[in-house]
Amino acid sequence: KLASIRTYYNFMQKKMGLAQNPTENIKSPKIEKKKIEFLTIDQIDTLMTLPDESHKGIRDRAILELLYATGIRASELIDMSCSDINLRMGFLTCTGENVRARIIPIGKLAREAVEKYMQSSRNLLIRNNPQEEHLFVNYHGQPVTRQGLWKILKEYGEKAGFEINLTPQVLRNSFAVHMLQNGADVKSLQELMGHEDISATQVYLAFTKNRIKDVYDRAHPRA
């Protein structure tokens, strides 16, 4: 790394009498911050109206609703089995990237969409592979792949006319931003998203400045 090399030459100048530090005019490369892309609530509402009532559409609606309702990762969705979701109690169990499982609530609209899919479309899709345990399957009754999931989302993003590419991460970002904008605390959001380091969750605070000001205006006696 440049910093280490620069430190070495600084040492050589001070201790060994090196005439010049060859790194002194070299600028450290700027590390670009990864842009966080997310949808507005109105865009989410539009998105959820796009899937039709075909078996594919019913499945796709369940996928979209569940990704947005829970903020889970693409890998967590495609690895999910039917036993991981409890529609009656309204939660799912997600192991994710960490060993420790986390429990995530599922909202009413997502529960209804997943229940409709499980009671109708999924049974048809797995007719040639009835032992399949993965929740989301393709036309062949096999688990939806990562590539397949991205293709599904891209299709609906283009239908909606979004300026950004619709990906699982965009829906995960949308979940995080909307939760914070509506009053969720960072620590709780960290638990829901499965972040080991809270700094990974805090990046979303940049999109909640208006909410923070509203809280201040309501709470501070001299605001």
Task: Tell what function each PLM region has.
Residues K1-A223:
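Conserved catalytic core of the tyrosine transesterase superfamily
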